[in-house]
Regions:
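Single-stranded RNA-binding regions, centering on S1/OB-family and related RNA-binding modules
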Residues: 1-174
Length: 175
């Protein structure tokens, strides 16, 4: 069974062998790598085990194919760990091998197998990704965001969520 984590906490695909990558592809294992670029074809570029990999825009986040994800949300993945499943091994226009990746599929798997099964009172590990005056946005698994409202952070009055949490901090949250 797949264990779902926040982005940055999956097995890195950067130095895996071709055989290990094929095994991960066959089992739909969620891996991660740092996105190297967002190109003019609107796809994220990676390198896995010395082989080029691309993630088409529609596969960069669940909802991207319907237009509910903006380019800036994908562009901000560059230089950061990004989780995905390997969809296929294809060849590019030059005849070189190229992996096709999907973060959207990893997110759909996380929702269906993990998040949708949570009940009130369940505790889940989160990573704070962004702080606003009204609360903190947290990665609850595979880059899926959830809001932790300011009034749920403290029993005493605080002026800012930054009084209790910081970006990158790993916390436990109750549903």
């Amino acid at each position: 069974m797949q264990t779902y984590r926040t982005e940055g906490n999956y097995r890195s695909a950067d130095r895996l062998s071709a055989a290990e990558l094929r095994t991960a592809m066959a089992s739909h294992e969620i891996l991660q790598s740092t996105a190297l670029a967002f190109d003019t074809a609107r796809q994220l570029r990676f390198e896995l085990g010395g082989v080029r990999a691309v993630m088409p825009f529609e596969q960069c986040a669940d909802g991207a194919e319907t237009g509910s994800v903006r380019d800036i949300a994908v562009l901000t993945r560059v230089g950061r760990p990004t989780c995905f499943v390997i969809e296929e091994l294809d060849t590019d226009e030059a005849g070189q091998p190229c992996y096709r990746l999907s973060r959207a599929e990893a997110q759909r798997m996380c929702k269906a197998d993990y998040l949708d099964a949570l009940r009130p009172g369940d505790i889940l590990p989160c990573t704070v990704t962004h702080i606003e005056p009204f609360g903190a946005f947290c990665d609850v698994g595979c880059g899926i965001s959830a809001l932790l409202p300011i009034d749920c952070m403290s029993v005493s009055r605080i002026s800012s969520p930054a009084d209790r949490v910081s970006v990158g901090q790993q916390i436990l949250c109750a549903i």
